[in-house]
Amino acid sequence: MLSRKSSNWLLNVPSQSEATTSVNLQSTEVGSITHTSSDDNIATPQDGIDHIDNDRSSSRAENIDMTASMVSHSRSLASLRPVMSSNFQNESDHIDDSLEFDLMRSLNESIYSTDGAISKPFMINEMPQIFDKNSNEDITKNFFIFTSAGKPVYSMYENDKFSASYIGLLTSIISFFQTSNEDNIKTFTSKESNITFVFCNKDPIFYVAMSRCRDESRDELEAQLHFLHSFVLSTLTSKQLTKLFQKRDNFDLRSHLESTDFETLSEICSNFTDKLYPEFSLNSLQCLKLKKPIRAKIHSIMSSQLNKMEDFPRGTLLYSFIIASNNRLCNVLRPKSHTLHPVDLQILFLVIATQFHNLESDKELWIPICFPKFNSNGYLYCYIRTIMNPGDKSSSKFLGHPPVLVAISGQKDAFFKMKSYCDELMVILTRNNEIIRELRTSILQPYSITDIPAPLVHHFIFKSSKHIQFTMPQLSTSASEPEQRALYERKLKFYYKSLQNSIAQEIASQSNKSLVNFVQWSEPAKSNSEETTDHDSFIEEPVNMLGMVWCSPRFELLLLFNNGIVTRKQALSSARRIVRWCVSNESSLFINEGATF
């Protein structure tokens, strides 16, 4: 997770005349630029955005802390590695770069318009293949959940014949360390198989992650195990777990879990392993892009409807949400002094997605959920239904992806009150054609990278630190088959994880600094004699991907550029355009306060 303290700092980035990028296929360095603001050089983050491409004096360049960090090399990624270092260049290099920039501008003129103005970014719909043909045939990652008595609870690969053996071995290892050292084992790595095991002791339940992925640290795996524990607590409170195992040490926890609970566990593990899931790595929520007046109108309707419910004792309704497809938050009604933790909401969204996957859209649910960050010893009760019924004329407008309406109460017997509130709210919303039309457009036609004038950008993720929410364009892939789309998500996941890992140490040690870091991945083109994967039209294209991460007190930006030659000056210019676009569209991209009572 990338987090910054709230403060204003001016980001100083050297101009192209001061610093450039050199690529060495044998190198594994990542160039990073950090700067700490002094009292005589403080400006708003917007000022830093506006002047990011300005030339700096030599004295200013001396204040720039140029650092490099090593990035591990993974053989499972076809020898793909980050290769970038930062250095200063002389005046002749600046002339060459100016010529290169002029040539690039001429090329832009020939592609886009006669006057050289770039109205739409040039982008490709695919990224080059980065995985070995057989890299996904073996299990590269697994999660185990079992009790202190060695009773299995869950394994990511339930049919894996080695799961029972693994759990028995892991239980023995844990017991040995507890007996010999009176301490808990945290992690170990097998040298022969290069498998890392990370342990999380939440007695009476143990969680273990097994991973061959070199780009995952122990802290990342441990955080994933903590999230799994949070989900288990959402089904059985901490008090209930303690009571169950006090009665019987060898209690079988699986008997208290529903089939949908195991489905949700599998979905969580899949998100951690194969899917692009920024919600977890950024510790935030994705918000549906919606016009500010429409969102405000929905919030007003939610508040006014609550005020009309005369038979509602104070505190009956705690929270209400409207959630769009793909776990995108649309609207929220909450108390003025309270809000739910992102982890609690992520669990809620995952539960909703799993529950409605097996139900018809006109069904309603009444589910007890423990939100561990809110209160790990008690339940809240969630009334959940879709806003549209299949019989409604407006339902077909969402093409099977209607938004979901959630009402949360602390009272176990408040079902009919929650139902009454949601029914009345749904009637008002469905009668408003403008709201339905805008919701449909936002849900079914999310914005893409082509809507932002940022040349050569393939994809980005922008997190607003103030809102604890992020936004990203729809995935830029033409893959129609699930397998190809899954491969595309794995590529994005690998690149974004590498970007975040490249600044993890700097973020932890330099909390008062803004940071820009570049990572470049390079690999020679495959020869004709090498094996290639089927259905991959870019297999012969050499990998030359540039990524950028920009952290400031106000935002975090993860950015991937098209495969090919992209200079750092072009990258900074496009990054600035994206930040400006996100800031100027903040009211439609993020929820500020929501409706409060």
Curated annotation (Swiss-Prot):
GO terms for molecular function: guanyl nucleotide exchange factor inhibitor activity; guanyl-nucleotide exchange factor activity; phosphatidylinositol-3-phosphate binding; phosphatidylinositol-5-phosphate binding; phosphatidylserine binding. Transmembrane segments: none annotated. Its main location: membrane. InterPro entries: FUZ/MON1/HPS1_longin_1, FUZ/MON1/HPS1_longin_2, FUZ/MON1/HPS1_longin_3, Mon1. Pfam families: Fuz_longin_1, Fuz_longin_2, Fuz_longin_3. It is found in: Endosome, Multivesicular body membrane; Prevacuolar compartment membrane; Vacuole membrane. It is a peripheral membrane protein. Residues 33-62 are annotated as: Disordered. In complex with CCZ1, is required for multiple vacuole delivery pathways including the cytoplasm to vacuole transport (Cvt), autophagy, pexophagy and endocytosis. The MON1-CCZ1 complex acts at the fusion of vesicles with the vacuole, through its regulation of the SNARE complex during the coordinated priming and docking stages of fusion, and particularly at the stage of tethering/docking. This is Vacuolar fusion protein MON1. It comes from Candida glabrata (strain ATCC 2001 / BCRC 20586 / JCM 3761 / NBRC 0622 / NRRL Y-65 / CBS 138). The gene is MON1.
